[in-house]
Swiss-Prot record:
Gene: ugpC
Catalysis performed (reactions): sn-glycerol 3-phosphate(out) + ATP + H2O = sn-glycerol 3-phosphate(in) + ADP + phosphate + H(+)
InterPro entries, sorted: AAA+_ATPase, ABC_transporter-like_ATP-bd, ABC_transporter-like_CS, ABC_transpr_MalK-like, ABC_transpr_MalK/UgpC-like, Mo/tungstate-bd_C_term_dom, NA-bd_OB-fold, OB_MalK-like
Lineage of producing organism: Bacteria, Pseudomonadati, Pseudomonadota, Gammaproteobacteria, Enterobacterales
Similarity comment: family membership: Belongs to the ABC transporter superfamily. sn-glycerol-3-phosphate importer (TC 3.A.1.1.3) family.
Binding site for ATP: 37-44
Protein name per its UniProtKB record: sn-glycerol-3-phosphate import ATP-binding protein UgpC
Source organism of the structure: Escherichia coli O6:K15:H31 (strain 536 / UPEC)
């Protein structure tokens, strides 16, 4: 096994504007890291830099304790799996998986052994003589993974490999990828815009925005303690409720823009008088009553999702979403009395957007 290290790497196309700001990342031997973020955040550019398909402007890349910053892709010990499979249509499954080894001059017996083992791992044994057109989307993606596996790379690089699959097949392939990583234990760097893929596959998640790694942490850390407003708004479905306002001068209440006041029981005196953004996830808002000091919300819309329901309303101009149990189905225009548990509140600086 081998690790991967990015040391203050940057990328600029014109020598002036950095599309990747100085970024440092240590990926341990056998670790599965997922880079997630919106389109244009730099995640695919960073992956291509690791692969050697794009040159690093400044900084260094290390794979298996070797500096590979200027090395050609073929010499880096990496294997890539792409969104579009990139299979040769005139070749069989077996020939597609073997082709990369063949052009490297590997012996026929060794190639056959590697292909056979990869086919066994991916349950492709009975499909080796078929052409890509005879396969389903999931089977084609497994062939693409098999082609990477036979190379026995130091690092796997995945560039949105599940994007072309339908929703049901994506769920199945996520499970297969998890099982594959547990078996192979190969260091992996995976790019996706899908937060569900990121949260279910990753041992650690790197949330990217504008060429910056906003947060690197386990899925639980990123979800429970988002480092910034961007992470809070990007991770989670539905997104965290983010309410602009200020802590009052005594540090005892949070005053929302729009007139609603929320009680803060303690620990906020150091933020007294400051503009802040208060965050709380929809599932952490509890139903209460007027007598118990609940805060009123007039519900605009109810989304019935099956396992649970989402109630939408507004406090002033600010939107609020509350996740309700399946049996809770209030009608539009009704008033919900809400309790926001203080141990589930998140505060972000009003100017920097960073968690406080």
């Amino acid at each position: 096994m081998a690790g991967l290290k990015l040391q203050a790497v940057t990328k600029s196309w014109d020598g002036k504007t950095q599309v990747i700001k100085p970024l440092t990342l240590d990926v341990a031997d056998g670790e599965f890291i997922v880079m997630v973020g919106p389109s244009g955040c730099g995640k695919s550019t960073l992956l291509r830099m690791v692969a050697g398909l794009e040159r690093v402007t400044t900084g260094d890349i290390w794979i298996d304790r070797k500096r590979v910053t200027e090395m050609e892709p073929k010499d880096r010990g990496i294997a890539m799996v792409f969104q579009n499979y990139a299979l040769y249509p005139h070749m069989s499954v077996e020939e597609n998986m073997a082709w990369g080894l063949k052009i490297r001059g590997m012996g026929k017996q060794q190639i056959a052994e590697r292909v056979k083992e990869a086919a066994r791992i991916l349950e492709l044994d009975g499909l080796l003589k078929r052409r890509p057109r005879e396969l389903s989307g999931g089977q084609r993606q497994r062939v693409a993974m098999g082609r990477a596996i036979v190379r026995e790379p130091a690092v796997f690089l995945f560039d949105e490999p599940l994007s072309n699959l339908d929703a049901k097949l994506r769920v199945q392939m996520r499970l297969e990828l998890q099982q594959l990583h547990r078996r192979l234990k190969t260091t992996s760097l995976y790019v996706t815009h899908d937060q569900v893929e990121a949260m279910t596959l990753a041992q650690r998640v790197m949330v990217m925005n504008g060429g910056v790694a906003e947060q690197i942490g386990t899925p639980v850390e990123v979800y429970e303690k988002p480092a910034s407003l961007f992470v809070a708004s990007f991770i989670g479905s539905p997104a965290m409720n983010l309410l602009a306002g200020r802590v009052n001068n005594e540090g005892t209440h949070f005053e929302l823009d729009g007139g609603i006041t929320l009680l803060l029981n303690g620990g906020y005196r150091q933020y007294a008088g400051r503009k802040m953004t208060l965050g709380i996830r929809p599932e952490h808002i509890a139903l209460s009553s007027r007598a118990e000091g609940g805060v009123p919300l007039v519900m605009d819309t109810l989304e019935i999702l099956g396992a649970d329901n989402l109630a939408h309303g507004r406090w002033g101009e600010q939107k609020l979403v509350v996740r309700l149990a399946h049996q809770e189905r209030p009608t539009a225009g009704s008033t919900l009395w809400l309790h926001l548990p203080e141990n589930q509140l998140h505060l972000f600086d009003g100017e920097t957007g960073q968690r406080v």
